């Protein structure tokens, strides 16, 4: 593979994470405007965004098999057509049913693109370099989560219709579409060149189960925590601006953490540093929940920084449980993480209704403790050392 081809594929991976980050995180910015557009209360409008999450979940799950049937380049180009149709549907329709369908299609497109992006990184890079590259790729999710809410605020403040925000997000996919030209993708399944030697199917091992549970608990814990931090802070008497600043601080330090750990991870055994980070994150979250108001900003800043590498490290370790990176295995762990996203309000909503926001934060803290236990247990069964040893950089 030529170096220019590798760079193009890497940028497709970066932009695939930016696309999903933009679609997921911009929701809160435009929800009120969309509710006004359809003349509905915000509470009922928020339910339609479940179609976006459902599309992401279904596509990540199915793409483990689709990757071996439909070439990756074909998927990305067809995804561009679907993206154009979905954005056009948002622009020219006043039907709530069509809005929900367009959101579902956007979810499908971003889920397929992100699973391809993740797989490309696991194919292009090996050993410790894979972890650092995947972490840098994941930082584009957070970067888009910072940039596109600002774009949305800029457009909405000038009374420009909300659907132009999605047109701007579509430009990210336009860049992916352009990059597919003159670019060779890894062939999979029936499209791959088969050698004379039969391909030995590798067993995943119990370590994959530990990582899948860790992925689900981490995402459910993280989103359950950050979703209720503003309500918890307001309950302590903090202003709305101060409560919002806590969330901004978390994501800002999370992004800086990703950049820092994309360099740091190269020098450590991934399972050991993951266990340390998971343990630190659980302790820091507990200190945030039980600490004083004066210390809360510092605890959430350090929590964001030290927890930033956890999810990507889980995916990287998963890809290293087999000698050859398996798209089905990577997508299985991604699917478990996405299930955590879907369950966020299903799990935390009733807890808040019954016991208040602090109970939801403590539940999230318990889930982080489960992540630590899973990562610790993985140390006894992980195969990543024997598979990545020859490829370590």
Curated annotation (Swiss-Prot):
SUPFAM superfamilies, A to Z: MFS general substrate transporter
Spans through the membrane: 11-31, 51-71, 78-98, 101-121, 134-154, 162-182, 206-226, 245-265, 273-293, 298-318, 332-352, 361-381
Signal peptide: none
Keyword Kinase belongs to the record: no
PROSITE patterns referenced in this protein's UniProt entry, alphabetically: MFS (PS50850)
Membrane topology type: Multi-pass membrane protein
Protein origin, superkingdom: Bacteria
Subcellular location as annotated: Cell inner membrane
Pfam families in UniProt: MFS_1
Molecular function via GO: transmembrane transporter activity
Keywords: Cell inner membrane, Cell membrane, Membrane, Transmembrane, Transmembrane helix
Any one GO CC term of the record: plasma membrane
Chief location: membrane
Family: Belongs to the major facilitator superfamily. TsgA family.
Protein name (record): Protein TsgA
Originating organism: Salmonella newport (strain SL254)
């Amino acid at each position: 593979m030529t170096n220019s081809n590798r760079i193009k594929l890497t940028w497709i991976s970066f932009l695939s994470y930016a696309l999903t980050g933009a679609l997921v995180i911009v929701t809160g910015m435009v929800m009120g405007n969309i509710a006004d557009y359809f003349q509905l209360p915000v509470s009922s409008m928020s339910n339609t965004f479940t179609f976006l999450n459902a599309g992401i979940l279904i596509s990540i799950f199915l793409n483990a098999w689709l990757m071996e049937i439909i070439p990756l380049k074909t998927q990305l180009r067809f995804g561009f057509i679907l993206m154009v149709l979905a954005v056009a549907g948002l622009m020219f329709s006043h039907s709530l049913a069509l809005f929900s369908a367009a959101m579902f299609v956007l979810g499908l497109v971003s889920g397929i693109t992100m699973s391809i992006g993740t797989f490309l990184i696991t194919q292009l890079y090996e050993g410790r370099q894979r972890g650092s590259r995947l972490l840098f790729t994941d930082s584009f999710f957070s970067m888009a989560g910072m940039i596109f809410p600002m774009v949305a605020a800029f457009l909405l403040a000038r009374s420009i219709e909300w659907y132009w925000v999605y047109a701007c997000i579509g430009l990210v996919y336009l860049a992916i579409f352009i990059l597919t030209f003159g670019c060779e993708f890894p062939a999979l399944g029936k499209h791959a060149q088969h050698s004379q030697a039969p391909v030995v199917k590798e067993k995943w091992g119990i370590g994959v189960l530990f990582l899948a549970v860790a992925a689900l608990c981490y995402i459910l814990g993280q989103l359950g925590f950050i979703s209720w931090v503003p309500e918890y802070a307001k309950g302590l008497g903090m202003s709305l601006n101060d409560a919002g600043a806590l969330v901004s601080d978390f994501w800002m330090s999370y992004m800086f953490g990703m950049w820092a750990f994309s360099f740091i991870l190269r020098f450590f055994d991934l399972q050991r540093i993951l266990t340390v980070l998971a343990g630190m994150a659980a302790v820091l979250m507990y200190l945030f929940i039980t600490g004083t108001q004066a210390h809360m900003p510092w605890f959430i800043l350090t929590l964001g920084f030290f927890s930033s590498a956890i999810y990507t490290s889980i995916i990287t370790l998963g890809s290293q449980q087999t000698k050859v990176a398996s798209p089905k295995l990577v997508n299985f762990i991604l699917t478990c993480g996405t299930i955590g996203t879907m369950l966020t309000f299903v799990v935390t909503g009733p807890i808040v209704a019954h016991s208040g926001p602090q109970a939801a934060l403590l539940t999230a803290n318990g889930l982080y403790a489960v992540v630590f236990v899973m990562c610790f247990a993985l140390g006894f069964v992980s195969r990543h050392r024997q598979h990545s040893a020859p490829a370590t950089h």
